[in-house]
Amino acid sequence: MADKMFKALLWAFATAVVMAEAVRGQLVPCYFVFGDSVFDNGNNNELDTLAKVNYSPYGIDFARGPTGRFSNGRNIPDFIAEELRISYDIPPFTRASTEQAHTGINYASGGAGLLEETSQHLGERISFEKQITNHRKMIMTAGVPPEKLKKCLYTINIGSNDYLNNYFMPAPYTTNENFSFDEYADFLIQSYRSYLKSLYVLGARKVAVFGVSKLGCTPRMIASHGGGKGCATEVNKAVEPFNKKLKDLISEFNRISVVDHAKFTFVDLFSSQNPIEYFILGFTVTDKSCCTVESGQELCAANKPVCPNRERYVYWDNVHSTEAANKVVVKAAFAGLITSPISILLLVL
């Protein structure tokens, strides 16, 4: 079983490499990023928030040190940019010039959610709705041609905080009291549909939407909802209907936008979190953080010890993944191993 899975991974990666090599140069003219801390590359540095990581040991393996990325090194958008053969940095919105709207901007913000109230206890954050507003202003001010915008890649990672920092954090939130798992998923998807429509109106035609991962298997939720002994089943059960409905939403958008040659794909982070696959890929620690996290916290303690074998860990802190895990996700997404209906590579070609 493990041998077959390993061979499948190798075959898929090799196929993706061959396809990419058939196309010369940068694969898209611009790349726009939306989402939460998983994608944030420094926007929260400028905000009054607890969700800020512009300090050591964050960035310990990043060339420029701590930048506001919630990892020890490169995050998922960084690796996506590499796969797209983009030679320049995609700047965070808070430090981007108007001219950079022609080549790409990262609007993601730690703590952001589909709901405006999500993560309000942490302080300032740029919600998904506000990120889209920022994008609209930037491309309109810069005068980016509509035909160019249709050729850009758009990636979105949003929804985790609506569970971590809302539904499963009762005070000061009431969503847990008002919605069942299925009802809450419907409520979130209703907002997601509206936001995707907004991006579509603004020219997005190549869109990769990342689902929510197995939040119950993060060190944070294992400690708070799993009794410290294993994945929090209740949390994962809550997330499942959201991912299913989000995947259905992507299918819906592909059906209604086929005339306009728009393509949407779903990146399944939930089903891909398999212990056997982790082991095959060299990860031996899947339930603990690599950095030092103080009791009751989720982010790394400043200037405290970190594990030396970071390539063996899935989690960097109590929620966010290591550079090694981020790289695997992107390779799998470009090879089509965790995407539906098409790989990110086919999305941009």
From Swiss-Prot:
| Location relative to the cell | Secreted
- State the EC number(s): 3.1.1.-
Q: Which residue ranges does UniProt annotate as crossing the membrane?
A: none
Disulfide pairings = none
Q: What are this entry's molecular-function GO terms?
A: hydrolase activity, acting on ester bonds
Record keywords, A-Z: Glycoprotein, Hydrolase, Lipid degradation, Lipid metabolism, Secreted, Signal
Query: An example of a Gene Ontology BP annotation on this entry?
Result: lipid catabolic process
Q: Which domain of life does this protein belong to?
A: Eukaryota
Q: Where is the active site?
A: 37, 317, 320
**Sites of glycosylation?**
178
Q: Which InterPro entries match?
A: GDSL, GDSL_esterase/lipase, SGNH_hydro_sf, SGNH_plant_lipase-like
Q: Where is the signal peptide?
A: 1-25
* SUPFAM superfamilies reported for this sequence: SGNH hydrolase
* GO cellular component terms given for this protein: extracellular region
Family assignment from sequence similarity: Belongs to the 'GDSL' lipolytic enzyme family.
Q: What's the protein name?
A: GDSL esterase/lipase At2g19060
Q: Give the taxonomic lineage as stored in the record.
A: Eukaryota, Viridiplantae, Streptophyta, Embryophyta, Tracheophyta
